[in-house]
From Swiss-Prot:
Chain's role: Produces ATP from ADP in the presence of a proton gradient across the membrane.
Similarity field: Belongs to the ATPase epsilon chain family.
One Pfam family in the UniProt entry: ATP-synt_DE
A molecular-function term among this protein's GO annotations: ATP binding
Protein topology in the membrane: Peripheral membrane protein
InterPro entries membership: ATP_synth_F1_dsu/esu, ATP_synth_F1_dsu/esu_N, ATP_synth_F1_esu_C, ATPsynth_dsu/esu_N
GO cellular component: chloroplast thylakoid membrane; proton-transporting ATP synthase complex
Keywords recorded for this protein, A-Z: ATP synthesis, CF(1), Chloroplast, Hydrogen ion transport, Ion transport, Membrane, Plastid, Thylakoid, Transport
Disulfide bridges in this chain: none
Subunit structure: F-type ATPases have 2 components, CF(1) - the catalytic core - and CF(0) - the membrane proton channel. CF(1) has five subunits: alpha(3), beta(3), gamma(1), delta(1), epsilon(1). CF(0) has three main subunits: a, b and c.
Superkingdom in the source lineage: Eukaryota
Gene name per UniProt: atpE
Major location category of this protein: plastid
Descriptive protein name: ATP synthase epsilon chain, chloroplastic
Organism expressing this protein natively: Pyropia yezoensis
Length: 134
């Protein structure tokens, strides 16, 4: 048995396929989904979703959103998403360094919040790209 997964971003359908297992970055921590999971609606955080197809794990960066599972159908609505295969690790590491510098230079609360969000996104991209190459 498999899960039917559909990841939808505002500009495109990122993923529409079957998988055996999913690990989601929910707002309360990592959430594992297997076939036969109870119906659920959950908020997603910025982070790396891991999809197991056959015996291979594929990381996908999610930029927050919502996930609904019912009858082995997982629908994920996200603010943005990026497959690890599309991420340049050196560029992602550079973006993380830049975001970290922005946070240390931030003086207002707004600047700190924006820099923190950039760091979270950059960390997720580095994590996904690293996982894809190992």
């Amino acid at each position: 048995m498999t899960l039917n997964i559909r990841i939808i971003a505002p500009d495109r359908t990122v993923w529409d396929a079957e998988a055996q297992e999913i690990i989601l970055p929910s707002s309360t921590g990592q959430l594992g989904i297997l076939t036969g999971h109870a119906p659920l609606l959950t908020a997603l955080d910025i982070g790396v979703m891991r999809v197991r197809v056959d015996k291979e794990w594929m990381p996908i960066v999610l930029l927050g959103g919502f996930a609904e599972i019912e009858n082995n159908q997982l629908t994920i609505l996200v603010n943005g998403a990026e497959e690890a295969s599309q991420i340049d690790l050196s560029e992602a590491e550079k973006n993380l360094d830049t975001a970290t510098q922005l946070l240390s230079d931030a003086s207002s609360n707004k600047e700190k919040i924006e820099a923190t969000q950039k760091i979270r996104k950059a960390r997720a991209r580095v994590q996904a790209a690293t996982a894809a190459t190992s």
